[in-house]
Amino acid sequence: MEILPKYKPEEILAIIHTHPKGPAEPSINDLLMARHVLTNNKNTIHGVLAENDGKLQLIMYNYWTIDGSKLAKMLSRFLDNGVKPPREEKLKVAHAYVTNIEDFDVSKIPEIADHFALWRYYWLIDTSDLFVFDPSNIDIYKKLKEKALFIPTGRDEGWLVLGVDTSGAEPIVYKVKECKDKVTLRSTGHEFSPIIVEWCKEKPMCRVA
């Protein structure tokens, strides 16, 4: 099994993140007021870091529901000639999530931009095979970062592969599904197949962290 390279955005226009929660259709003005937008092209912006009433806010969009062509057109209009879209114009993005971040370290953007890094950051594996919110467990964070592959299959579910290496050993695979404040893991045994790996390689959001 080939270990996929870690995603590194080529261009930073604003800061991005993904998360399948929150209100729908944030305004294009959220983008225009942003300090940073992280993207590899104008069609794949996932979210912004903005300031509102003196507080830093991370506005995270779901990758799968962005209207890429409309977003590209709106951004081009603004970035190329400074024309600001009307306030009522909305991005057709489902599941935006807004959170205040007091001490956000911009230098960590490449880490956070990785889709699996998002899951690592908000949940960890504990002894009961659950992902539970707790970003403070550095040991598990590092272990997942070194030996895990996340394959998204929908807005709130995907495959989690542990023990990925080049030795040919059978990987440990879980089907992951978000459920309110935690993510349940169900071992899939031999359900994992090379077909999934090949499919994964073609997806921009699928990578080893």
Swiss-Prot record:
Residues 1-67 form the MPN domain. It comes from the Viruses. One of its GO terms (molecular function) is metal ion binding. InterPro entries: JAB_dom_prok (IPR028090), MPN (IPR037518). PROSITE patterns: MPN (PS50249). A motif (JAMM motif) lies at residues 17-30. GO terms for biological process: proteolysis. The keyword Zinc applies. Zn(2+) binds at H17, H19, D30. The keyword Transcription does not apply. Keywords: Hydrolase, Metal-binding, Metalloprotease, Protease, Zinc. This is Uncharacterized protein ORF209. It comes from Acidianus two-tailed virus (ATV).
